[in-house]
Amino acid sequence: MINMRQSHPLIKMINHSFIDLPAPSNISTWWNFGSLLGVCLMLQIITGLFLAMHYTADTSTAFSSVTHICRDVNYGWLIRYAHANGASVFFIFLYFHIGRGIYYGSYQFKETWNIGVILLFMVMGTAFMGYVLPWGQMSFWGATVITNLLSAIPYMGPTLVEWIWGGFSVDKATLTRFFAFHFILPFIITAMVMIHLLFLHETGSNNPSGLNSDSDKIPFHPYYSIKDILGFMFMLLLLLALVLFSPDLLGDPDNYTPANPLNTPPHIKPEWYFLFAYAILRSIPNKLGGVLALVFSILILMLFPIMHVSKQRSMSFRPFSQCLLWILVANLIILTWIGGQPVEHPFIIIGQLASISYFCIILILMPTSSFMENKMLKW
């Protein structure tokens, strides 16, 4: 008699995705981040659902409802901080996942990669709208500044901004619709993740060598399911350490002040995981130019499959490209630091240089180094 997990229509799908899935025998811990992101997403949906039970999306009560969650709801503080810091952990893993994809040439699975980039945009949008919900000073002013960027769009910009606001400023209508979008988007993201996995399982996983691994596959369970559980333990340890010891480490103190449209904070900045993009936005004096640079700083990821000129897929055996990738990582850390600094003398020029080098490394230096490596190997 055939096994139920191989015959039942629904269980068969799960079986082919997580149990009998043929996986390369040599994939490293860098391949753990996909499943970790899935766990993060589930955690965010669960904690978010419980927060939504107590939160009120109204300008007069939003701030006090968050205070009520932390003070009066059973373990409300835990749920709230797990959700807030869960977002930070989510982005750390997202950036690792993308970095792994660039290093090992996983972007050559074009459909999987492009859906991944769309997912990144959706997660960023969700996180931004979530940051607005507590209705603190940074929530209000962050929403005002970022939504205002759309006014740079020629002809239809100002109308578009008022349409998003639902009025002539960020107010009750804006908060209500942001809550609605913040609630629905994670479910759309979950559906997109399934499509992401569907395309990945069409080709099978890449591996550190970048070579075809069809001749050497092992079942996902028990090998990688056990390996992933180890990753989950580390993730839980990191998240609990953040939540229980320093829950406000990555937050902004200004957000503990209720939103006040009459009082602008001295320095408006987004959450730490958007600072690199914010630095690129600020480095261009022109409004439309800054917005375009901001969008292209993420959209540039879609160009990776087109710009791949190396004869080798992975960077494992390409020292020049490896160096450039780590310079790019250092550059992104500098941009993140600059995004959190005030707009004054040394920081402005550092931000501009880091922004130029970000685009130069990806668009010029990386393809050039790949071309040189080909020549050195007489390919």
UniProtKB/Swiss-Prot annotation:
Concerning PROSITE patterns, the annotation shows: CYTB_CTER, CYTB_NTER
Q: Example GO biological process term? A: mitochondrial electron transport, ubiquinol to cytochrome c
**Which residue ranges does UniProt annotate as crossing the membrane?**
33-53, 77-98, 113-133, 178-198, 226-246, 288-308, 320-340, 347-367
Q: Where in the cell is it found?
A: Mitochondrion inner membrane
Q: Does the keyword Transcription apply?
A: no
One annotated GO molecular function: ubiquinol-cytochrome-c reductase activity
Q: PANTHER family given for it?
A: CYTOCHROME B
Q: What else is known?
A: Heme 1 (or BL or b562) is low-potential and absorbs at about 562 nm, and heme 2 (or BH or b566) is high-potential and absorbs at about 566 nm.
Q: What protein does this entry describe?
A: Cytochrome b
Source gene?
MT-CYB
